[in-house]
Amino acid sequence: MSFRFQRSDERKHHGGLEHGSCMAKDLDWMRERFEELSKSGLNWDPPVLESANAPRVVINGKETIMLSANNYLNLSTHPKVVEASIEATRRYGAGSGSVRAIAGTMDLHLEAERVAADFKGVEAALIYSAGYTANVGLIPTLVNGKEDVIISDELNHGSIIDGVRLTKAQRAVYPHNDVGALEAVLKENQDAKRKLIITDGVFSMDGDIAPLDEIVDVAEEYDAMVFVDDCHGEGVLGDGRGIVAHFGLQGRVDFEVGSYSKAMGVQGGIVAGTEQMRLHALNHSRSWLLSGSQPPGVAAAQKAAVEVIIDEPEHVRRLWDNTDYFRRELESLGFDTGVSTTPIIPVMCGESTTAKRLSLAMRDSGVMVGAIVFPMVARDKARVRTQMSAGLSREDLDEVLHAFEKAGKSIGLI
């Protein structure tokens, strides 16, 4: 069978692109689906920032205290990070011009990976375009088929879930942070050819930490691989080096995924581990092989952000000072902060309507905090999620606490 492509003048003659007849005739399902989302209040309508994503931002012309960003260490505007990006862009250009595998790897990328590996205390690292692409690209390469099993925490991030769905391995989910249940699954599957345990390091909805030390002990007993997504732990735990350093597990975790777009304030994902892991991912991970290379300015900023964390430990200390103070004061006002032990501090509300009312009241007071409702969390576990920043002053925090007290009383939450 042969095909002949129409010339543009032929398409116009037949009313093609000009009149939209080449498009699918019925796209009403999109509108109907969006209307259903809107009716249930689950549609996304992102606020638009008119400034840098800093402790105080401008939204709709109004100065607002930012408590919803991942910019934990406030490095997105750090002079050393910004200048590194500008200098590299001037020298190397705005883009890398190719995928990494063909002609898009620059010395800047390798330098950023070397600095990250040294920082993590591992042999090697490989940078991806995002933490999401690291998970969906690497996980499918670690198992072959039905003879293998993936065992995943029930509250793992959606990018992990998507990565697991791309595999043909057997799948098991264990109750959140329940190492006993994890071991029971390992026992049931001890004859599997490959066993892969996957967990978040810091869980993004509740702000609690995986018992990675216990997970690694069990994994070694059953000869299982350990994969940890530490996107919310890097720059936060273990003097900034993440959950592996926090528990002193260097050399015992097979795959450590991280993100440059959170505490490091830049963009991109990273996988850290052995040199063999890097070579494996570089040759088999489709999301790495088929994604455009990070722009030179981004690679330089990635390297600079890690160097700032190493050279200026006061950022991590200030983050934890703010976190401890803010959580303690919230609880003294009568708010429930759940099981959080990190800079992700939820204010538990129960019903979705309560969380939305609290979020709106805080917005009216000049504070940006997001309502997290079903299906992102259970129906009775709605909350307003706050995320702490090292850049917030004590005066900023007191202003936020006053707004929470006022809003909480007005809606009957405290």
Feature locations, PLM:
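Short loop-beta-helix segment that forms the pyridoxal 5′-phosphate
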Residues: V99-A103, E113-G137
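Conserved PLP-anchoring active-site segment centered on the Schiff-base-forming lysine
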Residues: L138-G158
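N-terminal "arm"/small-domain region of PLP-dependent enzymes with the aminotransferase-like
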Residues: D26-Y92, A224
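Active-site PLP attachment segment
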Residues: D239, A245-H280
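Structural motif of enzymes handling amino- and sulfur-group chemistry
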Residues: S293-E312, R318, N322-D324, E331-L333
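Conserved PLP-binding catalytic core of the aspartate aminotransferase-like
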Residues: R317-F326, E331-G366, M376, D380-K381, ...
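Active-site phosphate-binding strand-loop segment of PLP-dependent enzymes
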Residues: A172-V228
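PLP-dependent enzyme catalytic core of the Aspartate aminotransferase-like
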Residues: H19, P79, E83, E87, ...
